[in-house]
Amino acid sequence: MNNAQTQSEKIVQLLSEKTMARAHEILKEGVTAATLARAVASGKIQRLTRGLYQLPNAELDADSTLAEVSKRIPKGRICMSTALAYHGLTDQMPRQVWIAIGAKDWEPKLDFPSIRIVRFRKPYLEYGVERHMISGVAVPIYSVAKALADAFRNPKLVDRSVAIESLRSAITQRKASPSEIAQAAVDCGAWKVMRPYLEAMTHNG
């Protein structure tokens, strides 16, 4: 009984520090599966989705969904419209979390939250990845410049009007310099498409 209580306290302490944790992280702390199940049943902790837990009174920010996805898909990178929205470049919030994985990676299936998978080859997958702390989780998100390059390079995935709006926001808000944006566009194969828009905005600015 005392041991079970100690294990229960371990769960609460871990979730207090990390905001959310996967089952294997909790079990690694010496907690049994039975104790974990009892903690959920008693309301001490909350099951967000399969294998992911948090405290019931946890204060989660608006981007906590990104932390959930990152926990469930550790190899993924937040991309496209979701990355643009995270950086404050567009007011159009995507209904799904856009996440990039490798060309040959296994495609994950989540019941919640809703995700949209994009496959990138190795150079594009690793380029411009930043780690942002969200709800205690280091979430890999593409930089402003990389997210813009992806948006212009993939017009079937991101509407051109959204890409242009995001580019203008990045420049006016100084989220990235024109040279940084241009370099990412060159490196990611989007320069030919982006160039006239970027040059017009910088000449007018």
Give residue ranges: language-model regions:
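A short, conserved structural fragment
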Residues: 43-50
